[in-house]
C-alpha cells in the first residue's frame, strides 16, 4: 500500500492526517490513554516531550554556514513576518475579548489563534516554491525560518504586546532544546545528519498526540473561521512580505508571497502556550483547530498565488 504517497498528496498531510486521527480517537475513545497505560499512554498524551525532542532535532538540522545575501533575504522575511504578527497582536488585543469570539461564523478566533497562525512560515513549502520560481539563494533563505519553530517567538510577541506575562525561565526552557541541538549539529556534521533525519520522522508522532487534545466537534464548529483565518494570514502577512522583499530584500515579491503561509508546527503552539500561561487554556483547543485549518488553506492557496505572481513579475516565468 502506498500510504505515505497518499499522505504526501494532502497539503500538510504528514502533520494533519495524524492530527485528525488523534482527534478522532479523543472524540470517540477519550479515555484510551489512561486505560491502556504504559507506552500507549505515552504516545497518546506525550505532546510536550515528543515536541521537545523534535525542537532539539530541528535545531541540529540547521547549518550555520550561509552566504550574506541568503541571511539578508531570510532575515528580512522573518523579521517582517514577526513584526506583522506583533502588530496584529496589538490590534487584536485591543478589540477581542480575552476568551476570543464566542458566537457567529468567526467563533473561536482569539489573539492566540491569530498570532500562532501568522508568526511562523512553512519553511518546506517556501523552499519548494522558491526552488521552482526563484533563485537558489532565495530557496536557501528558509534557514532562518527554522528559528521561528516552536513557541518562543509567539511568547515574545504576546509578551511584547502586553497580552501575557512569562517568567524568564520559561523563555530559556522553550529555546534550550533547540539551542543544544543547534550547537551539537554545527560542532559535528555527523550529529547534524543523525538528528536532522529525525525531524520529519517525529512530526506524525507529536501530531497524533496533539490531536488527542482536540474534539472533532471543535474542528467542525470552527470550520468557516479556520478558512477565514487562512485567507487572513495570506493577506495580512503577504502584503508586508511582498513590500519587504521588493524594497529591502532586493527581490520581486515572489519570496514574500511564498512566505505568507502558516507552518504545520504552528498547530502545536496554542497547547504549548497554554501549558506555560494557563490563562490561554480556555481558547487553546479552538485555536489549535483554527491553526490546523489555516495550515491547509495556506498550503493550497500560497502555491497558486506564488505561481501567478511569478508569471506576472518574474521575467524567467513570464
Swiss-Prot record:
Q: Name one GO cellular component term.
A: plasma membrane
InterPro entries noted in UniProt: 2keto-3dGluconate_permease, 2keto-3dGluconate_permease_sub
The UniProt entry lists membrane topology as: Multi-pass membrane protein
Top-level taxon of origin: Bacteria
Q: Which UniProt keywords apply?
A: Cell inner membrane, Cell membrane, Membrane, Sugar transport, Symport, Transmembrane, Transmembrane helix, Transport
Pfam families assigned to the protein according to its UniProt record, in alphabetical order: KdgT
Q: Which NCBIfam families match?
A: kdgT
- Family membership, please give it: Belongs to the KdgT transporter family.
Q: What does this protein do?
A: Catalyzes the proton-dependent uptake of 2-keto-3-deoxygluconate (KDG) into the cell.
Question: Which protein, by its recorded name, is this?
Answer: 2-keto-3-deoxygluconate permease
Its organism's taxonomic lineage begins at: Bacteria, Pseudomonadati, Pseudomonadota, Gammaproteobacteria, Enterobacterales
Q: Which gene encodes it?
A: kdgT
Amino acid at each position: 500500500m502506498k500510504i505515505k504517497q497518499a499522505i504526501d498528496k494532502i497539503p500538510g498531510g504528514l502533520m494533519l492526517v495524524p492530527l485528525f486521527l488523534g482527534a478522532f480517537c479523543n472524540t470517540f475513545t477519550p479515555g484510551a490513554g489512561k486505560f491502556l497505560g504504559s507506552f500507549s499512554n505515552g504516545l497518546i498524551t506525550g505532546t510536550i516531550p515528543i515536541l521537545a525532542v523534535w525542537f532539539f532535532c530541528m535545531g541540529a538540522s540547521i547549518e550555520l554556514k550561509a552566504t550574506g545575501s541568503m541571511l539578508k533575504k531570510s532575515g528580512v522575511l522573518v523579521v517582517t513576518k514577526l513584526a506583522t504578527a506583533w502588530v496584529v497582536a496589538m490590534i487584536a488585543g485591543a478589540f477581542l475579548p480575552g476568551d476570543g469570539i464566542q458566537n457567529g461564523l468567526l467563533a473561536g478566533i482569539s489573539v492566540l489563534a491569530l498570532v500562532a497562525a501568522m508568526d511562523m512560515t512553512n519553511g518546506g513549502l517556501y523552499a519548494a516554491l522558491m526552488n521552482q520560481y526563484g533563485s537558489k539563494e532565495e530557496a536557501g533563505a528558509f534557514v532562518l525560518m527554522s528559528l521561528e519553530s516552536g513557541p518562543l517567538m509567539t511568547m515574545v510577541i504576546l509578551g511584547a504586546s502586553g497580552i501575557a506575562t512569562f517568567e524568564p525561565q520559561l523563555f530559556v526552557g522553550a529555546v534550550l532544546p533547540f539551542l543544544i541541538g543547534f550547537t551539537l549539529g554545527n560542532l559535528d556534521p555527523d550529529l547534524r545528519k543523525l538528528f536532522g533525519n529525525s525531524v520529519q520522522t517525529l512530526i506524525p508522532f507529536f501530531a497524533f498526540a496533539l490531536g488527542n487534545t482536540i474534539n472533532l466537534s471543535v474542528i467542525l464548529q470552527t470550520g468557516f473561521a479556520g478558512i477565514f483565518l487562512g485567507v487572513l494570514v495570506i493577506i495580512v502577512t503577504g502584503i508586508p512580505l511582498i513590500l519587504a522583499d521588493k524594497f529591502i530584500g532586493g527581490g520581486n515579491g515572489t519570496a514574500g508571497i511564498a512566505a505568507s503561509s502558516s507552518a504545520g508546527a504552528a498547530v502545536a503552539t496554542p497547547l504549548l502556550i497554554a501549558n506555560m500561561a494557563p490563562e490561554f487554556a480556555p481558547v487553546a483547543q479552538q485555536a489549535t483547530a483554527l491553526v490546523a485549518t489555516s495550515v491547509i488553506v495556506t498550503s493550497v492557496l500560497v502555491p497558486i498565488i506564488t505561481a501567478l505572481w511569478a508569471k506576472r513579475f518574474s521575467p524567467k516565468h513570464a
